[in-house]
Amino acid sequence: MALHDENVVWHSHPVTVQQRELHHGHRGVVLWFTGLSGSGKSTVAGALEEALHKLSVSTYLLDGDNVRHGLCSDLGFSDADRKENIRRVGEVANLMVEAGLVVLTAFISPHRAERQMVRERVGEGRFIEVFVDTPLAICEARDPKGLYKKARAGELRNFTGIDSVYEAPESAEIHLNGEQLVTNLVQQLLDLLRQNDIIRS
């Protein structure tokens, strides 16, 4: 990764993060959903965004597949590319947090080091790790994109959970049982956001 030129200086905005948060009526944070493919990350994140939208919370959902259509379309699935994928998403999420948004991200993000990298970039108190913990057998049975079948057949290499490791969070802010109903999981997340005074509605 290239270092920026010494003449590139960070520009401070006249409108502060606190002013933006006051305008939105809630704090800016990242909810980082992590888990195996098929664990329900995107489904739960989407349902939570819908619930937050109904509460007039300003949100944005960054989904793993979607960012690879544009922002990260040049990246593959090597360890180096996966790390760069997460770094870019972390930078975008951080900018959105500074805009006062509640940012939801749904990425396998299999390595603890990359998730920690984003946590440090965003800052403590503004990064909520959400572990959607679903057994591999359940994820494989769901297999919404047919990826596990391809991985088992040897047609897809470096697939997380099959021939590439997933490092489960050791101390996520919230640990969700991915076999529960989505409505139950959304309620647990809303309760967490209220308990941490991120949203008040």
From Swiss-Prot:
CDD domains: APSK. Pfam families: APS_kinase. Its EC number is 2.7.1.25. It comes from the Bacteria. Belongs to the APS kinase family. NCBIfam families: apsK, PRK03846.1. This is Adenylyl-sulfate kinase. It comes from Shigella flexneri. The gene is cysC.
